[in-house]
Amino acid sequence: MPTPIAVDHLVAGVLADVAAREARVPFKEVKARSRDMDTPRDAATALLRPGCSIITEIKRAVPYAGEIAHLDSPQSVAALAHDLEQAGVHVMACQTDRRRFHGSLEDMRVARDAVDIPMVCRDIIVDPYQI
């Protein structure tokens, strides 16, 4: 069955972004850096805890509605992440897709630094470089 054209367009955009990132920081260096990262926070345990688990998502824009005005800087992303954790969120996703959601890995980093709960990268993952 052929892949829908919209999906091809999205994947092509992600692959172009990955190629640009890899031109700046080679995959070998990314792998080396990953060895020094903090231990991942356990999202599965957070979701399987007794009671109702809450997952939320941070994104700077929505393709059909445009930008979310109050998320205009890394500081605003960090502040929102902190506020959501204080409100009781158990797992937080951060939209890193630049083309449609105006997200970035920097958004993911500042959100993760602002909270103690597990973070999930929300993006189209098509290449080992992205992991």
Residues of each region from the PLM?
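Small/polar loops that bind or transfer phosphate-bearing groups
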Residues: T96, R122-D123
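Catalytic cores of alpha/beta
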Residues: M119, V126-I131
